[in-house]
Design a protein with these regions (language model features):
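Hinge/beta->alpha junction and helix N-cap segments in small-molecule ligand-binding domains
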Residues: 28-37, 55-65, 109, 119-130, ...
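Short beta-strand-centered segments that line the small-molecule binding cleft or hinge
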Residues: 65-126, 153, 157
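Short beta->alpha connector loops
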Residues: 6, 60-63, 84-89, 211
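Short, well-structured alpha-helical segments in soluble
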Residues: 64-78, 188-201
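Amphipathic helical "hinge" segments at domain boundaries
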Residues: 4-72, 79
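Flexible loop/turn connectors
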Residues: 192-300
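Periplasmic-binding protein-like
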Residues: 24-26, 77-85, 144-146, 178, ...
Length: 300
């Protein structure tokens, strides 16, 4: 087989039995860098295990989202799904998948698995505490926070970590320094204008992702604000945005491709266990803690 460089034909293999060798990645996320990293990680694991990948973008707010997903799984004869936020955090979607017997793995924000189903966790809370703690260690006390969409649990976890770090240093969060937004460059631009217009503007800013932080940096520089001397700015995710700005952004490195690869591996193991009818298959939740990366945007 090795000498002939034989590769099993997926279509023939599917027809020969009842096993399917196609996985689906379903997402609703406007962050192109995140989606690309997820796809690369999933594809790497699929290729290593003889699986194909179907990528399906969707709108999580669509009232027919459950029917859309079930029909997609059935028509494509998918073996299982990889779900990322916010779809991975929607109970009605997960319940529908369970009811239909569709296997899936979730990428979730948190440090503890919510149930015994396959998932990979990202500890956004601890990473946000580290970022905020870094800003506090730099001597900042008026620290602003710009949030992403509330339907993403990562937003609430990062905001919770921000609040906890302030509390750890005996500082009460100022509500006028906390702004709700979306995970977008435009949110950063608009929010920094609002913050800089305050009678006492912040001296530091923690943005919920790098795209928001880049927008805030752009908006601050447009107003002649010196970053980091007058305003320190930190983001989250260590996306290409974080190194394409001037100055480069302090951030938390989130190994998205590795997270996606681990999630895919977990799903494939579950599929193989079902095929073997293994009753003692142990499901473990892998936890990733994003790592603080200090760059010039917060270095005085």
């Amino acid at each position: 087989i090795d000498a002939l460089d034989y590769r099993p034909n997926k279509a023939a293999r599917d027809l020969a039995g009842r096993d399917n060798y196609v996985l689906g990645y379903v997402y609703d996320n406007p962050n192109a860098y995140y989606i690309l990293a997820m796809q690369n990680g999933i594809l790497k694991e699929c290729r290593s295990n003889g699986y194909e990948l179907l990528i399906h973008p969707c709108d999580a707010t669509n009232p027919d989202i459950i029917d859309e997903l079930v029909n997609m799984v059935n028509s494509a004869r998918l073996a299982g799904l990889i779900l990322s936020p916010p779809l991975s955090e929607m109970p009605d979607v997960l319940q529908a998948m369970d009811d239909k017997g569709i296997q899936y793995v979730r990428v979730l924000s948190g440090d503890k698995a919510p149930d015994d189903k396959p998932c990979v966790l990202v500890d956004d809370y601890q990473a946000a505490r580290q970022i905020t703690g870094h800003l506090l260690d730099q001597g900042h006390q008026r620290i602003a926070f710009i949030a992403g969409e509330k339907q993403h649990h990562s937003t609430t976890e990062r905001q919770r970590g921000f609040y906890q770090a302030l509390a750890d240093h005996g500082i009460q969060a100022d509500p006028e320094l906390v702004i709700d937004g979306t995970y977008s460059f435009g949110t950063g631009v608009q929010s920094i204008q609002q913050l800089l217009a305050l009678p006492e503007p912040p001296t530091a800013l923690f943005a919920c992702n790098d795209e928001i932080a880049a927008g805030a940096l752009f908006g601050a520089r447009m107003q002649g604000v010196d970053v980091p001397e007058a305003l320190a700015i930190a983001g989250f995710e260590n996306s290409p945005f974080s190194t394409q700005t001037f100055p480069p952004l302090t951030t938390a490195s989130q190994p998205t491709a590795q997270i996606a690869q681990r999630a895919t591996s977990s799903l494939i193991r579950s599929l193989q266990a079902r095929k073997r009818k293994a009753e003692n298959h142990t499901i473990t939740a892998d936890i990733f803690v994003p790592e603080l990366i200090v760059r010039e945007s917060t270095s005085r």
